[in-house]
C-alpha cells in the first residue's frame, strides 16, 4: 500500500463502544520526512499514534508502518522504530553512557553509544548521573534511548512539553540531526511554531478526521493564504485615490489601510508607483501571511 512511504494509512477507524474517536483518517508519510500530527485534545491524535506504534488495535481501515501492519508487527519490526513517549522514566542512578549501553544491548545492530551521545548533544554530560540532569537533558537521554537501535522511524509525542524556550530550540537541533541522517520523524506537538520550524508536512485533525494536510506554509483555504499588507496613507492622499487594480479586500481605519491580496508582489509594485506619484512613502509598511497557528485556530474552531 505504501510503496516507498514510511507510513500509509487509509480509512482508519477506531471506536470505543458508541464513540468513534477516529473517523476515516488517511495519511502518508514519506521516508526521511519530518511529519507533524496536530489537533486539539480529544481530536484522535493519541489514538492514531498508538495504532501506528502497534499499541492499540484499530476498528477498521488499512495501516502499514515500514511495510508492516503494526497490529502484527513482531520484534524485528519493533527494532526498526523508536518511540519517545510524552513522559518517561529513566534510572536516576545510572549515567547517560551506562543508560545507552544498557538499551543498546536490546538491539541486534545498535548505533555506537558515543555517536548517539553526540547526536543528542550530551557529550559533556556523558558520565553524569541521570538524576543530576535538567529536564531538557533527561528528555535528550530519552531520545537517545529511542535512537540507539538505529531506527528507520521515530515517534516523538509532545517532545518539548515543559521546556523553557532555550531548551526547546536546542532540542529542535536534535530533530534537525535526525533529518540529516535520513530518519523519518513522526511528531505530535501543541506548539505551532515547533511544527512550523521542524515539519516538512503537517496534518491537522479535528473530531477524528483530517481537516488539512500539506507543507506548513501552504495549509488553509485560499482566502486564508492571502498576504496582508498594511500601511499609512501618505500626507495629502485619500484611500479613494488608491489604484483601482489592487484586487483583494481593502479596509481603512483613519489613515491606516489593510489590504488582503492573493498577489502581494504585484500589489506592492502598484502601491510603490502610486506612492511615488503622490510624493510620499508608504509609512509603517508591513507584509505578512497567516502563520500555521492562525490556520490551525481557524480550522479547529479554537477560540
Model-derived features: where do they sit?
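C-terminal coupling/interaction segments
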Residues: 2, 264-303
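ABC transporter nucleotide-binding domains
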Residues: 4-9, 14-206, 211-212
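Solvent-exposed beta-strand sheet faces enriched in polar/charged residues
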Residues: 10, 232, 251, 286-288
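Non-catalytic surface loops within mature trypsin-like serine protease
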Residues: 31, 124, 233-235, 263, ...
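A generic structural signal for secondary-structure junctions
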Residues: 82, 104, 108, 221-225, ...
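Short, solvent-exposed polar/charged micro-motifs at secondary-structure junctions
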Residues: 125, 240-241, 260-262, 294-298
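ABC transporter nucleotide-binding domain
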Residues: 171-262
Amino acid at each position: 500500500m505504501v510503496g516507498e512511504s514510511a507510513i500509509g494509512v487509509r480509512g482508519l477507524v477506531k471506536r470505543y463502544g458508541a464513540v468513534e474517536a477516529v473517523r476515516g483518517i488517511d495519511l502518508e508519510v514519506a521516508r526521511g520526512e519530518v511529519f507533524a500530527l496536530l489537533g486539539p485534545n480529544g481530536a484522535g491524535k493519541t489514538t492514531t499514534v498508538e495504532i501506528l506504534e502497534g499499541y492499540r488495535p484499530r476498528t477498521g481501515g488499512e495501516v502499514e508502518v515500514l511495510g508492516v501492519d503494526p497490529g502484527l508487527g513482531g520484534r524485528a519490526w519493533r527494532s526498526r522504530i523508536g518511540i519517545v513517549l510524552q513522559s518517561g522514566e529513566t534510572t536516576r542512578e545510572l549515567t547517560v553512557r551506562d543508560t545507552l549501553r544498557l538499551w543498546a544491548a536490546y538491539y541486534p545492530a545498535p548505533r555506537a553509544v558515543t555517536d548517539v551521545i553526540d547526536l543528542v548533544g550530551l557529550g559533556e554530560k556523558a558520565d553524569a548521573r541521570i538524576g543530576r540532569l535538567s529536564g531538557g537533558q533527561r528528555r535528550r537521554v530519552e531520545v537517545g534511548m529511542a535512537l540507539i537501535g538505529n531506527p528507520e522511524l521515530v515517534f516523538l509525542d509532545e517532545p518539548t512539553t515543559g521546556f523553557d524556550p532555550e531548551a526547546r530550540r536546542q532540542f529542535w537541533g536534535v530533530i534537525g540531526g535526525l533529518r540529516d541522517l535520513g530518519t523519518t520523524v513522526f511528531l505530535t506537538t501543541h506548539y505551532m511554531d515547533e511544527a512550523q520550524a521542524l515539519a516538512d508536512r503537517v496534518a491537522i485533525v479535528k473530531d477524528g478526521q483530517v481537516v488539512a494536510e500539506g507543507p506548513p506554509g501552504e495549509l488553509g483555504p485560499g482566502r486564508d493564504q492571502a498576504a496582508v499588507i498594511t500601511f499609512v496613507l501618505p500626507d495629502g492622499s485619500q484611500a479613494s485615490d488608491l489604484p483601482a487594480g489592487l484586487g483583494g479586500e481593502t479596509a481603512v481605519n483613519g489613515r491606516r489601510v489593510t489590504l488582503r491580496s492573493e498577489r502581494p508582489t504585484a500589489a506592492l509594485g502598484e502601491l510603490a508607483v502610486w506612492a511615488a506619484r503622490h510624493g510620499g512613502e508608504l509609512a509603517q509598511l508591513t507584509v505578512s501571511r497567516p502563520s500555521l497557528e492562525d490556520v490551525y485556530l481557524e480550522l479547529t474552531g479554537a477560540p
